[in-house]
Amino acid sequence: MTVKVCVCGGGNGAHTLSGLAASRDGVEVRVLTLFADEAERWTKALGADELTVIVNEKDGTQTEVKSRPKVITKDPEIAISGADVVILTVPAFAHEGYFQAMAPYVQDSALIVGLPSQAGFEFQCRDILGDKAAAVSMMSFETLPWACRIKEFGRKVEVLGTKSVLAASLIKGTAKTVDPLSTLQMLHGAEPVFRLAKHFLEMLIMSYSFVHPAILFGRWGSWDGKPVPEAPLFYQGIDQATADMLTACSNECKDVANAIMAACPGNDLSDVKDIYQWYLEYYHEDIQDDHDLYHAITTNKSYKGLVHPVKAVDGGVAPDFGNRYLTEDIPMGMIVFKGVAIAAGVAIPSNDKLIMWAQEKIGKEYLVDGALTGKDVATTRCPQRYGFNTLDAILTGKK
């Protein structure tokens, strides 16, 4: 049996996945990119040649994988019709366009994958696919599997590093699909090793979308507006107050998870960890001092040299609040979590404080007097936007 895979996107991740998946026996890869004339440019750039994926292995060696997608197109009917697996490797803000494009053509037995998904992926998918949403299966990954960069558009991409383990959540539909975990593992190769989370809300809650806003707030929350000489260190430059804010937001995540389990027995969110535990698990080899969250972040070697997003101004630099750390992490992260918290009846004052500060910085209005009634809520992926107003609706997809 040939597994038909549609890879959505034209960026670093789409290049990498297309090349790796197309190299597997019994796999047909179609690439769907809706952006401008990207499909035409990719087709022209590749010509009659093969796509090359350069993989930097953990032992220091390099492997070259050469393959060729069957088709690269802007036409969703060609790419989606009959596809067993549809994988979105585009930023969250672009998901809506792809869901709308696939809706008329996606088959009931399709597995729809967000790689990564970001919070609210399932709500948006269910809303746009309508009646089909109950049949299809949805899989959400927490991040991209690799650090990767296009070296030559349409022809060559390099994998700089590959994660060892990656978690995914799964909502099974009523129709029978290809086996989700083993199929995705086969498409990617030996690493990362994929593990299945117990619940899709575990992935949503543990996306920790408060981290970037909290660090920005910690550094710039009381900023006097005067330029600074250079961009401050981002993670390694946090203070104890920021670590305390991160802990408070994390505790509120646990509160919401516990409330959902109490209200809706049978929904297991017991794997929702506090952020300190998460750091110890995922970065144990990189952390030099792990006795508390503050030191776990500031001594994390993988964060060395990473600085705040800034823009040049007269006299130095100033914070760039138009960066994705706020423009994506608020509407596609914190607001989604806020919506779940409201449905669960749990107050999250620390998260609210960050949202109120951040929305002012990016000129948006989501939260008004603790309620999601702002004029820009319709641009977010909170469940309420789609009519999922209760815990039951959030969990089942039935409004």
UniProtKB/Swiss-Prot annotation:
Pfam families: Octopine_DH. Optimum pH is 8.0-9.5 for the forward reaction and 6.5-7.5 for the reverse reaction. Changing Q118D: Drastically reduced enzymatic activity. Greater effect on catalytic efficiency for pyruvate than L-arginine or NADH. InterPro entries: 6-PGluconate_DH-like_C_sf (IPR008927), 6PGD_dom2 (IPR013328), NAD(P)-bd_dom_sf (IPR036291), Opine/Lysopine_DH (IPR051729), Opine_DH (IPR003421). NADH binds at G10, G11, N12, G13, F35, A36, D37, E38. Its EC number is 1.5.1.11. Agmatine acts as a competitive inhibitor of the condensation reaction where the L-arginine and agmatine substrates compete for the same site. L-arginine binds at M206. GO terms for molecular function: D-octopine dehydrogenase activity; nucleotide binding. Changing D329A: 2 to 10-fold decrease in specific activity. 43-fold reduction in affinity for pyruvate and 18-fold reduction for L-arginine. Gene3D superfamilies: N-(1-d-carboxylethyl)-l-norvaline Dehydrogenase, domain 2 (1.10.1040.10), NAD(P)-binding Rossmann-like Domain (3.40.50.720). Changing Q118A: Drastically reduced enzymatic activity. Keywords: NAD, Nucleotide-binding, Oxidoreductase. It catalyses: D-octopine + NAD(+) + H2O = L-arginine + pyruvate + NADH + H(+). NAD(+) binds at C148, R324. Substrate binds at Q118. It is an enzyme of class 1 (oxidoreductase). The active site is at H212. Transmembrane segments: none annotated. Catalyzes the reverse reaction of octopine dehydrogenation. Acts on L-arginine in preference to other substrates such as canavanine, cysteine, L-alanine, ornithine or norvaline, owing to the presence of the positively charged guanidium group. PANTHER family: BLR6086 PROTEIN, OPINE DEHYDROGENASE DOMAIN-CONTAINING PROTEIN. Belongs to the lysopine/nopaline/octopine/opine/vitopine dehydrogenases family. This is Octopine dehydrogenase. It comes from Pecten maximus.
